[in-house]
Amino acid sequence: MNRRRKLLIPLLFCGAMLTACDDKSAENAAAMTPEVGVVTLSPGSVNVLSELPGRTVPYEVAEIRPQVGGIIIKRNFIEGDKVNQGDSLYQIDPAPLQAELNSAKGSLAKALSTASNARITFNRQASLLKTNYVSRQDYDTARTQLNEAEANVTVAKAAVEQATINLQYANVTSPITGVSGKSSVTVGALVTANQADSLVTVQRLDPIYVDLTQSVQDFLRMKEEVASGQIKQVQGSTPVQLNLENGKRYGQTGTLKFSDPTVDETTGSVTLRAIFPNPNGDLLPGMYVTALVDEGSRQNVLLVPQEGVTHNAQGKATALILDKDDVVQLREIEASKAIGDQWVVTSGLQAGDRVIVSGLQRIRPGIKARAISSSQENASTESKQ
């Protein structure tokens, strides 16, 4: 009996030692399993913004040209200043035009006198015709002379009206409210009616247009996504934000007005036009800008933090995920668009997948890893709501 006890005690001691070693090995193995931060994907909706290049265009442009010829005797504006509709810009010497008006009025008076005399003669001939004191031919001649005299009165009246208009045209006015440009003529210059060169250009800059360029591919993609319900657009005006050439955001929000139905054959693009308030004149014609157009709300979107997306040697987007057995798997994905610090993934991943976003340098496909909650998971969830 004592002998059995002596043999049993060493055996129990060895067994305990082996168990302790196994537990220690398990702890060491667990400690060696790399920890990775993951984000669990869930579908949501997100506003889609298209970044488009563009240039500013005046809302209205008036190239001022004289409608009568003559000598410029006065300029009534300061270059670069605001002018209102109807303001006088130039004064053309009115003396020759006034003389033409006076001559036209004299011709009208003469025509009226001739017509009055012809009417008296015609009335007399009409009375005598009833008593056969004049021939029918004399009566017809008197009637013809009266008609010609009345026609001459009409022509003379038109000449007076035209001369009056020409005299008014001697005062060259602005047809719009806007900012005047550089004058191309000075006092003393001879100008002609409807000449090719403008005297000055007036541009209305508040509001102001921005012409944007969008590729046909993006234009068709957006139409297809709206038609299929992938993008839900709010009825009404489409808001547009603007980034200036210095990188700063323009303080006013614009709206999309229309899209040109014609494709530019040289660039393969379409033109979109937006309109912006410009009360302070910060936007000038010809400025290069970048617009952010709100395409609408994309439904059932999977957003993946940019840290979780890499590109292989072929340039294709990939992501590492943890499967249900905590084994690292490599997925090839389609990351169609970047929104902020996240990618919109359209294929290769699904809701519920755990995408690895941190600890990537410690893992490779096929090994086990231990998931820990990522701080980006909350941010990702908030962006979808």
From Swiss-Prot:
Family statement: Belongs to the membrane fusion protein (MFP) (TC 8.A.1) family.
GO terms of molecular function: transmembrane transporter activity
Taxonomy, superkingdom: Bacteria
Lipidation (S-diacylglycerol cysteine): C21
Keyword Nucleus: no
Residues in the signal sequence: 1-20
Subunit description: Homotrimer. Part of the tripartite efflux system MdtEF-TolC, which is composed of an inner membrane transporter, MdtF, a membrane fusion protein, MdtE, and an outer membrane component, TolC. The complex forms a large protein conduit and can translocate molecules across both the inner and outer membranes.
Species this protein is from: Escherichia coli O6:H1 (strain CFT073 / ATCC 700928 / UPEC)
InterPro entries membership: CusB-like_dom_1, CusB_D23, MFP_Efflux, RND_pump_MFP
Keywords carried by this UniProt record: Antibiotic resistance, Cell inner membrane, Cell membrane, Lipoprotein, Membrane, Palmitate, Signal, Transport
Compartments, record wording: Cell inner membrane
Membrane topology: Lipid-anchor
Function: Part of the tripartite efflux system MdtEF-TolC, which confers resistance to various compounds.
NCBIfam families, per database record: PRK09859.1, RND_mfp
GO biological process, one term: response to toxic substance
Descriptive protein name: Multidrug resistance protein MdtE
Positions where lipid (N-palmitoyl cysteine) attaches: C21
GO cellular component terms listed in the entry, alphabetical order: plasma membrane
